[in-house]
């Protein structure tokens, strides 16, 4: 069904608002994907903070003008679905990669993040980015490791001199605090 001018303007405004707030964009060919597969993908997209929409490419190109994703405007050709990561940069990549495993017709065509356009093969790189919680856990581990190394060194010196357990326990308590 064809959209009238006001409906097209609403679609462009909605997509422009989403594009302005999004971290990354993946445009993927979806031809040959069944309705049940698309429904499952949309459900998972909502759960993972990904805005997923199928719109005409000309409307999408107008919507991304003035955003970081304007570099992708000339690559929007063919039947595409647009996946915008709203919460984490890698969320759309993980979604497309997961559904591409079970559906060989779903293929990423455009990958854009931070105003840069990447080859479609970079969807794997984007999908492998850690989530916010994983990144915070890695940071905490990196920050706590020097104190843990110091505690192990003090314990080793104490063990070598014969009274290491009490000294190491005291150092370990201060290192944890």
Curated annotation (Swiss-Prot):
Q: Which Gene3D superfamilies match?
A: 3.30.70.1730
| Domain of life, source organism | Bacteria
Keyword set for this entry?
Answer: Ribonucleoprotein, Ribosomal protein, RNA-binding, rRNA-binding
Signal sequence bounds: none
Q: Name one GO cellular component term.
A: ribonucleoprotein complex
Q: Which family does it belong to?
A: Belongs to the universal ribosomal protein uL10 family.
Q: How does it assemble?
A: Part of the ribosomal stalk of the 50S ribosomal subunit. The N-terminus interacts with L11 and the large rRNA to form the base of the stalk. The C-terminus forms an elongated spine to which L12 dimers bind in a sequential fashion forming a multimeric L10(L12)X complex.
Among PANTHER family, the record links this protein to: 39S RIBOSOMAL PROTEIN L10, MITOCHONDRIAL
What is this protein's record name? Large ribosomal subunit protein uL10
Report the source organism: Xanthomonas oryzae pv. oryzae (strain KACC10331 / KXO85)
């Amino acid at each position: 069904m064809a959209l009238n001018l006001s409906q097209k303007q609403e679609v462009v405004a909605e997509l422009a608002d989403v594009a302005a707030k999004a971290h990354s964009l993946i445009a993927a060919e979806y031809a040959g994907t069944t309705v049940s597969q698309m429904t499952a993908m949309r459900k998972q997209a909502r759960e993972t903070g990904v805005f997923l929409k199928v719109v005409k490419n000309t409307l999408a190109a107008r919507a991304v003008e003035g955003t970081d994703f304007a570099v992708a405007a000339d690559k929007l050709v063919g039947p595409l679905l647009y996946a915008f990561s709203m919460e984490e940069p890698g969320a759309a990549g993980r979604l497309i990669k997961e559904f591409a495993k079970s559906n060989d017709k779903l293929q990423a065509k455009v990958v854009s993040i931070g105003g840069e356009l990447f080859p479609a093969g970079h969807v794997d790189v984007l999908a492998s980015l850690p989530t916010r919680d994983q990144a915070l856990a890695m940071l905490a581990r990196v920050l706590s490791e020097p104190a843990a190394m110091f505690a192990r060194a003090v314990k080793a010196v104490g063990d070598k001199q014969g009274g290491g357990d009490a000294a190491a326990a005291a150092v370990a308590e201060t290192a944890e605090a």
